[in-house]
Amino acid sequence: GGWGWTDLSGAVPDADDTPGALLALSNLMQSGRLSDSQKERVKRASDLGVNWIMKLQNRDDGWPTFCRGWGKLPFDRSGADITAHCMRGIHAWQEHHPQRHRIQQAIRRGLRYLEKTQAEDGSWLPLWFGNQDNPGEENPVYGTSKVLAAYAALNLLETQPAQRGLRWIR
């Protein structure tokens, strides 16, 4: 059900590329350019992708990149950027998914994770895409931007965490 970062066979599905594929498919579905049979294929693929993402959510309410619950490798722990991207991806298909309530519950859990991991200054640190020019190679601009994009997609920019993030990024 998930998509990997390459078009070659044997790609490992991940929680960064799968939401990206879901967002692209959602835009394609809304384009008005698909036949009924193409729409059905896109819907089936999106259902599989949404289900894959939902099964990946960690007990801490966030999403890791590859494997649920491992936590031993850096990319298997939950990250704010990955969590936000997963939330956007599944939210895009919420109206079309047969288990809409599960998506809503997963998003609520993801929001809890984002609130728990927000830094005191209002920023969020990403799991991926560090900045070698920043001490510790952290990239709070990227992390905060990914999270704010999710808050915007969910119409939650007026919430306290989003407002703190917006103040930080300005």
Walk through the language-model features, giving the residues of each.
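An alpha-helical repeat/solenoid feature that recognizes helix-turn-helix modules
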Residues: G1-R112, K116-R170
